[in-house]
Amino acid sequence: MKAASSDQNQKKKRPQGHTASVLDLSNLSSPAPKKAHKKILNDIQWPGSPHSNPEGSSHYGYQEYTPAQFPVANRFTEMMRMSALGILVVMVLNFGSVYSQGKSLRHDVVAASSEGVESITQSDSLNGTVLTNAALQFEEAEQSLWFLQSQGTALKQGTPSVESIPELLRAAQDLSSAAAGFMEFAVALKNPAQPLLSRQPVPRPSLTTPLLTSFEKHFQPAVLKVISANRVLQTAPLSVVPSTLQPELSRAKEEIAQLSELLILFNEAFPVMLQLLGSEHPQHYLVLLENNNELRPGGGFIGSYLLIDLNDGYLDELSFHDVYDVDGRFSEIIPPPEEIATLTDRWGLRDSNLSPDMSLSAQKAQWFLEKEGGPSTDHVITVDLETVRQLLAMIGPVAVEGLQKPLEADQFETVLSYIVESKLSGAESPKTIFNSFIPAVEAQLREGGEGFPLVGLISEMARQKHLALYSKQEDIQAFFERWGMAGKIVAPPANEDVLMVVSTSLGGNKSDAYLSQRVDHHTVLTQSGALLDTLTLTRQNNWSETEKEKVRELLGSYGFKAIDEEVMTILGAGTNVAGLRVYVPQGVSLQDVQGLSGTEVTVRHDEALGLDYFYFKSIVAPGEQQKITLTYELPFGSKNGMKEISSTTHGVCRSLKI
């Protein structure tokens, strides 16, 4: 990595004590943020009631099916619309009952506030003009509300709950005033002195200081107003409005409560975002590019990585590296763990992600990079193919130098893998294509101005565990963990049933792209109080001649006609060979094995996670299916035949009363 110049590393000194901070909201009551699930299960089903057999045992079970490929939704736009509409609902619907005695006045307020929100929700892209106009329209609404407040005596006449009217009016005023503050903050976000993450020579204006100033001046006071208004709304009785409007007021309460939660979360997140942009010190990132068509417990095979330096919001470095370069220069022999000993006799960065806890895998990757002569980094970002696929779906096809047509979301992986595995750019530098692909993606992302959707994509990919973040800085790592972005495995409480199935590709190919897996798990409570789990894994290799022709047709459309059979084997036609770990509670006793010989399954212990796991190999040829069933007794039971247990799979916890 190139050393950054001393000018680039120098940061403008801030006034003493003027650092990004989280607004103290401890004195305001607001609903606590909802905790996100740590992992997603695809198509999980739970029985509504237990099934009993003639022997008196009770059965509980679920089914999970993981297809070879599945789409991921982006919900960020809907979340932003919900937030803006929350303001509109309260400002319009709540006022409706109070303004029923002054229709002309009501019309002025509704029109002004509606126009302001529509400027947010209906514009295709946020720009300075739109945001400025929206702020002016919200200001008009605020002026109307001040006039309304002076008419309190008249408004009280005939009102069922007169004491709530002044509070509702003040809440309405707070909301409209807050909306104007949010617009001012949005203008600062949208119109920095230079584009965020741009490359600019020094001297250059600070990008993070104006953002922090606007955050403290406009956003944080607006948050306080929304929380205060929410507190008033939650205590206001529905009887304050006519019965015909009570359902709408109820919905308005819910919307503003959700908006309040979102703003509190953003208030916590924004100072951390500034830190990550290098607001106080330059930040150094290791981005692991993992191929989840060749699975590893911590994501996928690490074929390449990026080194990124951010300083005061500017991108000072972005460089691409082939993992075999740094591994190849490392002369020390570190024996690999037993489970990957058939792949290599030297452990290196490319095989560092062997823990399903992505934080632990990230730490190991940092260790190997430094051990092998690479730079020290502050943070690690783990990214797999699904994240890139969704990014391309968001920004559109990308034109890459040397290709006959742009790369699309559902094509890029096959095309780039073929170019690399065929060594079209030479055996010494097979990944040269990425030196064109990555800048092309970066340029198109900038041109499209996809800032808000990109934040939503990052959040969604982290939720799906296609992306994970790790930081050496304890406060930032704690933030990642609270937001469910660290990929961390949380140790379960004592006497809880746990199930997590992870895979390590051992076949040297990308056949995991065509491998679907079904997990059937049943818990039986016997009359004696013992708990027996039965786990069935059904693994199907979906590669076929049809898939082969699809690959040939796709590559042919890019001008690649003669596809070598050996390369086709690597792309997915080869036999799927995997080392499987089935994580279970510590102390389980294996009772029976079907589909494998008993000697092929060993019980091992993961000290870092505090869990046992069954380890065995699975071999599935193209077009074939393998079914493996394990029966094991849990180390805890129920003396009286009634006990509450939980089954945790991939981090999602469900409770069953038995």
Model-derived features with residue positions:
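N-terminal intrinsically disordered, low-complexity regulatory segments of eukaryotic proteins
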Residues: M1-R14
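Non-catalytic, solvent-exposed segments at the cell envelope interface
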Residues: K2, T19-N27, H37-W46, H59-G61, ...
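Arg/Lys-rich low-complexity patches in intrinsically disordered regions that function as generic
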Residues: K11-G17, K34-K35
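Sec-dependent N-terminal signal peptides of Gram-positive bacterial secreted proteins and lipoproteins
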Residues: R81-G96
